[in-house]
Swiss-Prot record:
The keyword Transmembrane does not apply. Belongs to the NPY family. It is found in: Secreted. Coiled coil: none annotated. This is Pancreatic polypeptide MY.
Length: 36
């Protein structure tokens, strides 16, 4: 099971937020791929 991405801090920059969204998307893809 891949580690879940850390939640961005409340004062995270837009760049950090977009990086976080990408990490979450990759994380979800990894999980769904492992299931099938």
């Amino acid at each position: 099971m891949p580690p879940k991405p850390d939640n961005p801090s409340p004062d995270a920059s837009p760049e950090e937020l977009s990086k976080y969204m990408l990490a979450v998307r990759n994380y979800i893809n990894l999980i769904t791929r492992q299931r099938y």
